[in-house]
């Protein structure tokens, strides 16, 4: 059988989506400002697809895409808004400053290290962020280790409450992602998760 392969898509060649084709019954729109994740979580397909690379759309293109929106409610569908390292931090700050110029409410998904940077949380709040989806995954250290969830292990499961509280202090809601049913879960640990 033939197998088709292509190179990595260059975001410089992106085209604006045909939002006029969408029906008006949707209450939010979506944009993608980057692709990939610097982490290598065992259960996640993102790194398998993108090879651990973190690629950014040009900010001027994102601005055009924002201006093409028909609604003021937005889901930023990036695999991980914050990423890791100085380049990612600089980029998220630039992105949030751009979004701040528009009257939007938005939600996105990130890793726990988003709570490390007060400037990011402040700009997220000021730019209209109302909701962040965070991958806590487990309160069991052995499960986190088996997931290769080092970003969580570094902070420790006892930090989860502080991370949530800190994000809430900026007026941003948190939805936590948890994986239940690992080899390390017990009936007791599943009930502890509720607390």
Identify the function of each model-found stretch.
Residues 1-14:
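Glycine-rich beta-alpha loop elements in corrinoid/cobalamin-binding modules
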Residues 15-175, 180-182:
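Radical SAM [4Fe-4S] cluster-binding motif and immediate context
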Residues 119-121, 184-195:
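Catalytic cores of alpha/beta
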């Amino acid at each position: 059988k033939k197998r088709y392969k292509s190179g990595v898509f260059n975001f410089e060649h992106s085209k604006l989506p045909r939002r006029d084709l969408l029906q008006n019954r949707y209450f939010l729109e979506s944009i993608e400002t980057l692709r990939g994740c610097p982490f290598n979580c065992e259960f996640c397909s993102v790194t398998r697809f993108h090879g651990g690379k973190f690629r950014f759309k040009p900010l001027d293109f994102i601005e055009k895409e924002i201006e093409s929106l028909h609604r003021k409610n937005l889901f930023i569908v990036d695999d991980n808004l914050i990423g890791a390292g100085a380049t990612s931090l600089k980029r998220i700050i630039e992105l949030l400053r751009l979004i701040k110029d528009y009257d939007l409410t938005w939600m996105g998904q990130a890793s726990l290290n988003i709570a490390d940077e007060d400037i990011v949380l402040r700009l997220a709040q000021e730019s209209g962020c109302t909701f962040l989806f965070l991958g806590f995954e487990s309160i069991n250290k052995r499960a986190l280790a088996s997931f290769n969830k080092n970003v969580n292990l570094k902070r420790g499961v006892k930090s989860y409450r502080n991370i949530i509280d800190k994000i809430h202090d900026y007026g941003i809601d948190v939805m936590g992602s948890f994986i239940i049913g690992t080899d390390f879960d017990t009936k007791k640990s599943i009930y502890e998760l509720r607390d």
